[in-house]
A protein has these predicted regions:
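A short, polar/proline- and glycine-enriched secondary-structure boundary/capping micro-motif
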Residues: 46-48, 85, 115-119
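Secondary-structure transition/turn motif
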Residues: 35-45, 89, 106-113
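Charged phosphate-binding loop/patch that engages nucleotide di/tri-phosphates or the phosphate backbone
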Residues: 190, 194
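A structural signal for short, hydrophobic beta-strand segments that form beta-sheets
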Residues: 16-22, 38, 85-95, 154
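Short conserved beta-strand and strand-loop elements enriched in small hydrophobics
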Residues: 69-84, 130
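Residue microenvironments linked to proteolytic maturation
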Residues: 4-7, 13, 73, 92-186
Length: 200
């Protein structure tokens, strides 16, 4: 298959985070955790990009060290930077595992300013997405997809509003399911959330 070098730099992969079980953990003083698909291999996402399984497996293996040291931090929204800014951190990834070509992740919401916003959004039944952030290049395949190349380096997983990978919405680990996607009055809702936090 002939491929043409297309682009290099910061790569984002957005997915709806279909979290199963989003709930305050009984054993951790009400800390909110979420579990769901955070990455998919071997299939095009909404950005027309394909991540080969061997590359994702390699990067996930490297990411385990950050998970072990509780340094697998992520931000709320998606900055155009290869560096995680501590002032914007909202969560930490605590575990990942493969189920077929789906990478499943468990995320713990942190008690930070951005983490409080994230928790408020979750509490308002807003369906969020998850997005990987990494550095690397892509090449165009004959089928018209952008294939991620071997130089890809994973930076982190961010929580976002518009993911590109299908099935990457996260759910609260709770008895109820989060099915409502709020599309209207988002700015008004964010103002209310910020006011709630400022009043704490």
């Amino acid at each position: 298959m002939t491929e043409i070098l297309k682009d290099s730099g910061l790569l984002h992969n957005f997915m709806i985070f279909e979290y199963e079980d989003v709930q305050p953990s009984k054993s951790s003083d009400g800390i909110v955790t979420m579990k769901g698909i955070i990455q998919k291999a071997q299939q095009p996402n909404a950005n027309n990009r394909i991540y080969p399984r061997p590359i994702l497996e390699r990067e996930d293996a490297k990411y385990q060290e950050l998970i072990k040291e509780r340094r697998a931090l992520g931000e709320l929204d998606h900055p155009d930077s290869p560096i995680v800014q501590l002032e914007n951190v909202s969560h930490v990834v605590t575990e990942t595992l493969w189920e077929g070509d789906d990478l499943i992740g468990t995320i713990e919401v942190l008690d930070t300013p951005k983490g409080q916003i994230l928790e408020k959004l979750i509490g308002r039944d807003i369906k969020l997405g998850i997005s990987s952030r990494g550095l690397g290049s892509t090449s165009r395949t004959n089928e018209g997809y952008d294939k991620v190349e071997d130089d890809f380096n994973l930076v982190c997983y961010d929580m976002v509003s518009n993911p590109s990978t299908s099935g990457a919405y996260m759910n609260l680990q709770e008895s109820r399911e989060y099915k409502t996607l709020v599309n209207q009055n988002r700015m008004v809702l964010l103002d209310e959330i910020l006011n709630d936090i400022l009043e704490l």
